[in-house]
């Protein structure tokens, strides 16, 4: 997953970040 969004940072750990 990409870390484009600041809030996605926590999503990255779960593998659900913004692409």
From Swiss-Prot:
Annotated localization: Secreted
Main localisation: secreted
Processing and modification events after translation: Conversion of fibrinogen to fibrin is triggered by thrombin, which cleaves fibrinopeptides A and B from alpha and beta chains, and thus exposes the N-terminal polymerization sites responsible for the formation of the soft clot. The soft clot is converted into the hard clot by factor XIIIA which catalyzes the epsilon-(gamma-glutamyl)lysine cross-linking between gamma chains (stronger) and between alpha chains (weaker) of different monomers. Forms F13A-mediated cross-links between a glutamine and the epsilon-amino group of a lysine residue, forming fibronectin-fibrinogen heteropolymers.
Entry superkingdom: Eukaryota
GO biological process: adaptive immune response; blood coagulation; innate immune response
UniProt entry keywords in alphabetical sequence: Adaptive immunity, Blood coagulation, Coiled coil, Disulfide bond, Hemostasis, Immunity, Innate immunity, Secreted
Coiled-coil parts of chain: none
GO CC annotations on file: extracellular region
Domain notes: A long coiled coil structure formed by 3 polypeptide chains connects the central nodule to the C-terminal domains (distal nodules). The long C-terminal ends of the alpha chains fold back, contributing a fourth strand to the coiled coil structure.
Primary role: Cleaved by the protease thrombin to yield monomers which, together with fibrinogen beta (FGB) and fibrinogen gamma (FGG), polymerize to form an insoluble fibrin matrix. Fibrin has a major function in hemostasis as one of the primary components of blood clots. In addition, functions during the early stages of wound repair to stabilize the lesion and guide cell migration during re-epithelialization. Was originally thought to be essential for platelet aggregation, based on in vitro studies using anticoagulated blood.
The protein's assembly and partners: Heterohexamer; disulfide linked. Contains 2 sets of 3 non-identical chains (alpha, beta and gamma). The 2 heterotrimers are in head to head conformation with the N-termini in a small central domain.
UniProt name for this protein: Fibrinogen alpha chain
Organism: Cervus nippon
């Amino acid at each position: 997953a990409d870390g484009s969004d600041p809030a996605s940072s926590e999503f990255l750990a779960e593998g659900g970040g913004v692409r």
